Swiss-Prot record:
<dbReference type="GO" id="GO:0006950">
    <property type="term" value="P:response to stress"/>
</dbReference>
<protein>
    <recommendedName>
        <fullName>Protein SprT</fullName>
    </recommendedName>
</protein>
<comment type="similarity">
    <text>Belongs to the SprT family.</text>
</comment>
<dbReference type="InterPro" id="IPR035240">
    <property type="entry name" value="SprT_Zn_ribbon"/>
</dbReference>
<feature type="domain" description="SprT-like">
    <location>
        <begin position="23"/>
        <end position="164"/>
    </location>
</feature>
<dbReference type="InterPro" id="IPR023483">
    <property type="entry name" value="Uncharacterised_SprT"/>
</dbReference>
<feature type="binding site">
    <location>
        <position position="82"/>
    </location>
    <ligand>
        <name>Zn(2+)</name>
    </ligand>
</feature>
<dbReference type="Pfam" id="PF17283">
    <property type="entry name" value="Zn_ribbon_SprT"/>
</dbReference>
<dbReference type="GO" id="GO:0008270">
    <property type="term" value="F:zinc ion binding"/>
</dbReference>
<feature type="binding site">
    <location>
        <position position="78"/>
    </location>
    <ligand>
        <name>Zn(2+)</name>
    </ligand>
</feature>
<keyword id="KW-0479">Metal-binding</keyword>
<keyword id="KW-0963">Cytoplasm</keyword>
<keyword id="KW-0862">Zinc</keyword>
<dbReference type="Pfam" id="PF10263">
    <property type="entry name" value="SprT-like"/>
</dbReference>
<feature type="active site">
    <location>
        <position position="79"/>
    </location>
</feature>
<dbReference type="GO" id="GO:0005737">
    <property type="term" value="C:cytoplasm"/>
</dbReference>
<dbReference type="InterPro" id="IPR006640">
    <property type="entry name" value="SprT-like_domain"/>
</dbReference>
C-alpha cells in the first residue's frame, strides 16, 4: 500500500488546531482533558474517525494532503468533539444534540456531519450490476462475495436479483 507522507508543517498545523480546540474545552469544563493520539491511518472516503476508548483520532492522509487547511479546520474539531462528548456524556448518538452543542458552543465551529471534499482519489472501484429496472454499482467487497457465491443482492425497487453486467470496474 502506498502511504502518503504528511509534511511536518502539516502535522504541526493539525496539532496546533487540536490543542487550540482542546484548550477551549478545558476552559469550558474546567477539566484537564488529555491530548488524543493522532494517527494518519484512515482509509477510504471517511475524512476521520474518533476511537472513543483508545482516545485517538485517525485522519485520512490523502484527504488531508489534498485539502490541507479546510480539512484541519473542519475534520480535527469534528473528531475531537466525538471524544469530548463521549468523555462528558457517555454513549450518545454520534451526531446528536450533545455533539452539535460541543461543536458550536464549546469548540466554536459549525456542526457539519459530513465533509464536502473531492473524493475521486480515494473512492473505491465499483462493479456494474443489473436488475429488471436499473443499473447498480456494487463495491469490490460485495462483488467478490457474489463471485465466490457467498452473497446475492436484490434491487430494493423491483426485487430482482442483481446480475453482474460487465467485466470492467468503474
Amino acid at each position: 500500500m502506498n502511504k502518503a507522507r504528511i509534511p511536518i508543517a502539516l502535522q504541526q498545523a493539525v496539532m496546533r488546531c487540536l490543542r487550540e480546540k482542546l484548550q477551549l474545552a478545558r476552559q469550558h469544563f474546567s477539566v484537564e482533558f488529555p491530548e488524543p493520539k493522532i494517527l494518519y491511518q484512515q482509509r477510504g472516503t471517511s475524512a476521520g474517525t474518533a476511537w472513543l476508548q483508545a482516545w485517538e483520532i485517525r485522519l485520512n492522509p490523502v484527504l488531508l494532503m489534498e485539502n490541507q487547511q479546510p480539512f484541519i479546520d473542519e475534520v480535527v474539531p469534528h473528531e475531537l468533539a466525538h471524544l469530548l462528548v463521549f468523555r462528558q456524556f457517555g454513549r450518545v448518538p454520534p451526531h446528536g444534540n450533545e455533539w452539535r452543542w460541543m461543536m458550536e458552543s464549546v469548540l466554536q465551529v459549525s456542526a457539519s456531519r459530513t465533509h464536502q471534499f473531492e473524493i475521486a482519489s480515494v473512492q473505491s472501484k465499483t462493479y456494474p450490476y443489473r436488475c429488471g429496472c436499473q443499473l447498480h454499482q456494487l463495491t469490490v467487497r460485495r462483488h467478490n462475495r457474489v463471485m465466490r457465491g457467498e452473497s446475492e443482492y436484490r434491487c430494493r425497487q423491483c426485487g430482482d436479483k442483481l446480475k453482474f453486467f460487465a467485466g470492467e470496474p468503474v
